[in-house]
Amino acid sequence: MAKISKRINKIREGVDRNKLYDLSAAIGLVKERAVAKFDETIEIAMNLGVDPRHADQMVRGVVNLPNGTGRTVRVAVFARGDKAEEAKKAGADIVGAEELFEIVNGGKIDFDRCIATPDMMPLVGRLGKVLGPRGMMPNPKVGTVTTDVAAAVAASKGGAVEFRVEKAGIIHAGIGKVSFDNAKLEENIKAFADAVIKAKPSAAKGEYVKRVSLSSTMGVGVKVDPATVKVVA
């Protein structure tokens, strides 16, 4: 415990927890304090002025980060016939119909994103209790229920990030790796923030983006001045 506390205190050195840093400085601080022995993920948290308990204040969407996420994303596709072949050629890791349903329904989920053709949704819909809590249920609003499975697979593999506001009005997402150069991280963050702004529900009143912070997987959180991520709402 003493070693853990010492490590945390060391990481926190030089970070003013009450200060709003501009985006560039925040990225630098987070990267400098990412000392784990693996390539940590850089994560963004945005506190929004919405109450997701009300359906008309739900915030969700998908954004293609210009520089990808740095993650290897495993993609499952529910499809039959030609669409199944299309998915395989596009690089999907798992493709199937009833047999894939049985695997997932049994609790084996060896993938990060799930795509389905519209005709498969009556079957996939029965997996709501399995996929829903994991945020993996295919949804046409984020492009994961589609006839263009090749494009959906390519987007998923290439840096597409889904976001959905949580109960407390917070959105979390991984937007890159510590190994990314600062400019690429900044581009990804601004693209993500822009997508969240564009997803603002009409029912949201008052200040939309209240707080923004960055952190790494094992590192300290750094508060960011929303204006420097082009957040103007």
UniProtKB/Swiss-Prot annotation:
Alphabetical list of CDD domains matching this protein: Ribosomal_L1 (cd00403)
Transit peptide among keywords: no
Source organism, top-level taxon: Bacteria
One GO location term (cellular component): cytosolic large ribosomal subunit
NAD keyword on record: no
Molecular function as annotated in GO: rRNA binding; structural constituent of ribosome; tRNA binding
One GO BP annotation of this record: translation
Keyword field: Repressor, Ribonucleoprotein, Ribosomal protein, RNA-binding, rRNA-binding, Translation regulation, tRNA-binding
A Pfam family matched in the record: Ribosomal_L1
Xref: PROSITE patterns: RIBOSOMAL_L1
Subunit structure: Part of the 50S ribosomal subunit.
Protein task: Binds directly to 23S rRNA. The L1 stalk is quite mobile in the ribosome, and is involved in E site tRNA release.
Family named by the database record: Belongs to the universal ribosomal protein uL1 family.
Protein name: Large ribosomal subunit protein uL1
Source organism of this protein record: Brucella anthropi (strain ATCC 49188 / DSM 6882 / CCUG 24695 / JCM 21032 / LMG 3331 / NBRC 15819 / NCTC 12168 / Alc 37)
Name of the coding gene: rplA
